[in-house]
Amino acid sequence: YGQDIVEELAKYAGVPVWNGLTNEFHPTQMLADMLTIREHLGHLKGVKFVYMGDARYNMGNSLMVTCAKLGMDFVACTSRKYFPNEELVDYCKKVAAETGASIALTEDVAEGTKDADVIYTDVWVSMGEPDEVWAERLQDLMPYQVNKAAMANAKPTAIFMHCLPCLLYTSPSPRDSG
């Protein structure tokens, strides 16, 4: 899943190489997600997009970059230890300054989800991580689950998204779960 492998392949392939998914980025998912958001909301510019969970890896990174480039307001709502890489955050803030987007990081769920247009989450344990991290992640990220309270704090028209596969749900909709 290494980004370096895709970059090396692209360097020597002699043909275009598309990054379907690496540990750092997931551009294929971005195309699908942005089309879905546009389909449901009618636009992308100015959309408040909240990512809840572990924002350090491919989904958090890709969503932050994509939102910055498309003029969307990105919020990583998670524990500080799961904030995205500072260097990438700085890059995204520079891009956001040119597109009218904004980039915010918060540990406060009420602040982060307030008036959100989109609330998005991902698996809490990423591909290739050892089983030993499960207990810590569940403890750390449980306050950042997308549930009824988080969705109620968003706009009434807000949509919930997940890049799949999603596991451990007790309800088919976050609007129904506690």
At which residue positions do the language-model features occur?
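Phosphate/diphosphate ligand-binding glycine-rich loop within oxidoreductases
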Residues: 1-38, 168
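Glycine-rich phosphate/diphosphate-binding loop of Rossmann-like nucleotide-binding domains
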Residues: 45-104
